[in-house]
Design a protein with these regions (language model features):
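P-loop/Walker A phosphate-binding loop and immediately adjacent motor/lid segment at beta-alpha junctions
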Residues: 92-99, 150-173, 209-212
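Inter-motif core of Ras-like GTPase G domains
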Residues: 122-142
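Beta-strand-loop-alpha "switch" segments that mediate conformational coupling across diverse proteins
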Residues: 169-171, 177-211, 222
Length: 231
């Protein structure tokens, strides 16, 4: 029904956000398909699953039936990503193939999330940003993200009418307020820092649903994003 692109500078926690947001949407009794054109199947590593060629983004782009190519992670949670065994990114597809796949996914699932590459020259990510109803732009991360924002000023301006800034505060002690001032943005929703995040990911545990004060704060931020993309 709707397409949401998740974008931002490298190392801003885009994929972690995408995985946990998709999981949260599925917990709300809505079907969600998380699509990632990222090479070497980063998603399969985070989720702890092996994505075969026949259940991959490559197969879907070549015209294989979508219902047979998506990989089921959990009830109502599906993934369409690069195959785990891929040794190099598959770039042998056209813009029309991407548009067709995105529209088919829109008609098939309640929510489609696309974990976009930071690079603006990636064809799949470019079309996902173009066709998206909403763009979640991860701001924060590392200081180097300021340079990325400056280098991609035109692309950011093109999507500004449908962009919601998400504060990705992944480094403890960093003055993110000063960074947001440099970026001239005010994140509407901030994702709190969770020190144990790498450990939980290694254990194949979602950050959404963690107990404790930080877990509740994280869930609160994710739930707000769910409202944004599902209403």
């Amino acid at each position: 029904m709707s397409i949401c692109a998740i974008w931002g500078a490298p190392q801003t926690g885009k994929t972690t956000l995408a995985v946990n947001l998709a999981y949260a949407v599925s917990r709300g009794d809505q079907s969600v398909c998380l699509i990632s054109p990222v090479a070497y199947s980063e998603l399969s590593a985070i989720l702890g699953v092996k994505i075969p060629e026949e259940n991959s983004l490559s197969a879907a782009l070549r015209g294989a039936p979508l219902q047979r190519t998506v990989f089921k992670v959990d009830e109502l949670f599906y993934v369409l990503a690069a195959p785990s065994a891929a040794s190099a990114p598959d770039c042998d597809y056209s813009g029309e193939q991407v548009k067709t796949l995105l529209e088919l996914a829109r008609m098939t699932f309640d929510v489609v999330l696309v974990d976009c590459l930071s690079e603006t020259n990636d064809l799949f990510s470019a079309w996902a940003l173009n066709r998206a109803d909403k763009v979640l732009l991860c701001a924060g991360g590392h200081v180097s993200g300021v340079l990325w924002h400056r280098a991609n000023k035109k692309a950011l301006q093109a999507a500004q009418d449908k962009t919601l800034y998400v504060g990705s505060e992944i480094i403890p002690g960093l003055d993110y307020a000063a960074m947001y001032e440099l970026l001239k943005c005010t994140p509407e929703i901030k994702i709190p820092y969770i020190r144990e995040a790498p450990l939980f990911q290694n254990e194949r545990r979602f950050l959404f649903g963690l107990s404790g004060k930080k877990g509740r704060a994280y869930a609160g931020a994710i739930n707000k994003l769910c409202e944004v993309i599902t209403t």
